[in-house]
């Protein structure tokens, strides 16, 4: 499954707003599709466990990079949050801005490690090693 989608929307000189918005929608659509595919794989697992997993999108617009996370909210809605935003340094004088970019990557890394733990739990629930409690993922697929 695609856990991270990366999209570069504009060049360094000027922003093309329409293109940036279309890319934002594309990231959301890809993330939702990835999560839907995962619901089919873990349909007998707990919905509460599944709500903890997300798909990530990185969008670069001019000199700004943004990390977003998309998760299931309920049967009919998804939620998307901006997790981190950083400015990309262009000159040596701006070099300290690289710390923001590294924090963004660190945040993504921690999130992906957490996602591996959740995937393990979902697998245990799927094969009934750990009995899921509450509604199952398949309840939102009907």
Predicted feature locations:
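Extended catalytic cores and adjacent scaffolds of nucleotide/polyanion-binding enzymes
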Residues: 1-142
């Amino acid at each position: 499954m695609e856990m991270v989608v990366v999209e570069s929307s504009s060049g360094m000189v000027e922003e093309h707003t329409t293109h940036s918005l279309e890319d934002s929608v594309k990231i959301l659509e890809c993330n939702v599709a990835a999560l839907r595919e995962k619901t089919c794989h873990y349909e007998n697992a707990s919905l509460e466990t599944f709500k903890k997993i997300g798909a990530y999108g990185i969008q670069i617009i001019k000199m700004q990079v943004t990390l977003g996370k998309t998760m299931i909210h309920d049967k009919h809605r998804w939620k998307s949050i901006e997790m981190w935003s950083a400015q990309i340094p262009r000159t040596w004088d701006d070099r300290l801005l690289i710390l923001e970019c590294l924090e963004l990557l660190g945040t993504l890394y921690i999130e992906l490690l957490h996602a591996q733990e959740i995937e393990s739990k979902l697998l245990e629930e799927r094969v009934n090693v750990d009995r899921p409690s509450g509604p199952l993922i398949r309840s939102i697929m009907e």
